[in-house]
Amino acid sequence: MDKRLLVKRTLGCVCAATLMGAILATHHDSLISVKAEEKTVQTGKTDQQIGAKLVQEIREGKRGPLYAGYFRTWHDRASTGADGKQQHPENTMAEVPKEVDILFVFHDHTASDSPFWSELKDSYVHKLHQQGTALVQTIGVNELNGRTGLSKDYPDIPEGNKALAAAIVKTFVTDRGVDGLDIDIEHEFTNKRTPEEDARALNVFKEIAQLIGKNGSDKSKLLIMDTTLSVENNPIFKGIAEDLDYLLRQYYGSQGGEAEVDTINSDWNQYQNYIDASQFMIGFSFFEESAPKGNLWFDVNEYDPKNPERGKDIEGTRAKKYAEWQPSTGGLKAGIFSYAIDRDGVAHVGKEYSQRTYQELEAGLKKHPVVDNISHTDYTVSRKLKALMAEDKRYDVIDQKDIPDAALREQVIQQVGQYKGDLERYNKTLVLTVDKIHSLKGLEKLSHLQKLELCQLSNVKEVTPDILPESMKKDAELVMTGMTGLEKLNLRGLNRQTLDGIDVNGLTHLTSFDISHNSLDLSEKSADRKLLMTLMEQVSNHQKITVKNTAFENQKPKGYYPQTYDTKEGHYDVDNAEHDILTDFVFGTVTKRDTFIGDEEAFAMYKEGAIDGRQYVAKDYTYEAFRKDYQGYKVHLTASNLGESDTSKVTATTDETYLVDVFDGEKIVPHMTLHVGNGATIMENLAKGAKVIGTSGDISLAEKVVDGVVADSFWTWDTKNWIAFDLNSQVIAKEWRLFNGETDPRFKDKELNIQKGRLQILKDKTIHLENMSKDERDSYLADEQNWITVSEITSNQKIYNGSITDITSRYWRFCVDEGVSSKSPQYTELQILGQRLSSDIASTVQD
């Protein structure tokens, strides 16, 4: 989240010093500053058994939608601070109602020798267990990474992390007699955690998961993470997700959109890659006393002097929206949670208080006369929210009305979830392997299922569209193996593009099938033709083949662009006509089985295909509906002189050769060579990588114009300049090209263009420049009398193309004589186009 989530704070102390102390310590990470109690706690066997049973019920979803709350320990009447004094007598954990499934012990400002800890282990745990509420201790992630608490006493080595994990579980779970551990991971606004600290925290977290949680040795304890971080910003979550019982995501304040849940929706799209919806809980915050800006969430109703009880009403609150929200895919959420449940029923301050600061509150300013005071709560809001979720029919348990077959129902509940609302949201794979399954009725309710595997279901007699998920009509995958008892296979009208995944050889009792009205390619060489013939053979083993018991007609195969094209070289005669490369060489459509259909005539022939006189393509299927449109494709041409253009049109006026790249919008589809007439030899940019041996300007800038990249410009403060370069061997040059100043992508300024310039070669082709001293060479290269001009620029075109009549030379120079304006003339690239001479020819030329 972009905004600062200064979460889980309290400012409820009376005196100014105490107020500031609370302010500095109430972020979740303040948990790290509290020394864990050293006393050993022994809980009675009965409480251990009850707690284990509660955890099992919660984990198995038998409690329905969960409601959880964070109780701030310093607001319990038994809590005392470092001074030994009672802090707030108004509330007690003992009064938390049965509607709260999980109560989090969120401790701060509570001394290690406070009576609270004995009350927790000797009274609260027992009382809350009796009513069905589990208790979980919350600690900050810095207890795991070496920053604070126990973690400072253990080395960051495998043995040390293992010992630290054991100490954490003993101190915070076993000795306190609670039912699990919750680790809080939030964004640090100052003194941010390092990657190394997060890596250590993850290692310790994994060691804790070996001890408690669903995958731990003690499965009677819950292992939970609560966080303000999204998936991409939480490497610890990604590393431990498979071991978590629940992920509690803090969504305090508006989350965007009309329903204020946009962030939740987008986050869930990522979370569902790591956890099930039944592990996902979203949270709101009650109003904390004396909270400053940055910690005012407006998740509950604002105070109304005309209605003092408005804080107990859930209508119109964000808390209610969270209770009603469900993921669109994956399943039903586990439930919701609240922070500062001890403030349940207290209305929120109004918007007029939204900018109040710590300093103002410390000075006794901008405090609300009613809601900033501590008051006794009866947990009305929590009760209402739990009741609202419990009344949600989507949480009704799947029964025989949904899925009549008991064996099928059991497998669906195991993999999908036990609630009716899970059926329509489940979007993963369902694997059915129990031979006791006789009927598949009810699977149609799995409207988002991505893959269905039917394996060894020998007692299933038929598979028909009315009992298959709606997603089968889209892109869901169907796998059938070992279906030896299947007699009727009906996949009619499911938009199936292939029969892949269906073990047709195993359908030994098949008496009829209907695969008509799909998108299958049943042409002679396709794989589906072979599968169809096997299906017909299976039916023929039991009865005579008829139209009624073997339906495969009315196919409408979907068209695709070919992955490869056969044409690697193309040819046009010199006919002075304009030709379209896309139309002539890049065309055609293929089926899912890669059957190529080039044009409408070929499609008409394809439609005539038949099996035993029965046409398999739908008569009303048209070429226009099948063919792929190449309108969005782009063609890039490189001529023999390396001139480039983006067009599919070529006018065949002279012998030429083009290198053709066709783009489908993302990648090159085909690459081909196109010859016009007798073709032409593809030239080389001989200047690319040439050695700059002299210049009137900066040599590092000069090297940019022969690096093969149209980017940085060469320029000098003078309006005239020159560059001399060595092509490293004798060449024969036919053309040259200059990329003028406006091609610099940084400026695109025509006033930087060159108006006049000259391309030159050395008069003396036998000269050995390498034998000269640097000063001698610089003087020689700068002397105009040593050069012959072979071509000139007389216009300020963006890209100037010049002709040279088969010039042979190794050393070249380009001179800028005039720009188009008072600005220093520039150019980004110079190309000399032609071929390098073989060594024997080069020697002859030099001689």
UniProtKB/Swiss-Prot annotation:
GO terms for biological process: carbohydrate metabolic process; symbiont-mediated evasion of host immune response. GO terms for molecular function: mannosyl-glycoprotein endo-beta-N-acetylglucosaminidase activity; metal ion binding. It comes from the Bacteria. A glycoprotein binds at H107, E188, Q250, Y252, E288, E289, N295, Y339. It is an enzyme of class 3 (hydrolase). Residues 65-377 form the GH18 domain. Residues 1-36 form the signal peptide. It is found in: Secreted; Host extracellular space. Its EC number is 3.2.1.96. Keywords: Calcium, Glycosidase, Hydrolase, Leucine-rich repeat, Metal-binding, Repeat, Secreted, Signal, Virulence. Belongs to the glycosyl hydrolase 18 family. Endoglucosidase that acts as a host immune evasion factor by mediating hydrolysis of the N-linked glycan from the Fc region of host immunoglobulin-gamma (IgG) during infection. Specifically catalyzes the hydrolysis of the beta-1,4 linkage between the first two N-acetylglucosamine residues of the complex-type N-linked glycan located on 'Asn-297' of the Fc region of IgG antibodies (IGHG1, IGHG2, IGHG3 or IGHG4), thereby preventing interaction between IgGs and Fc receptors and ability to activate the complement pathway. This is Endo-beta-N-acetylglucosaminidase EndoSd.
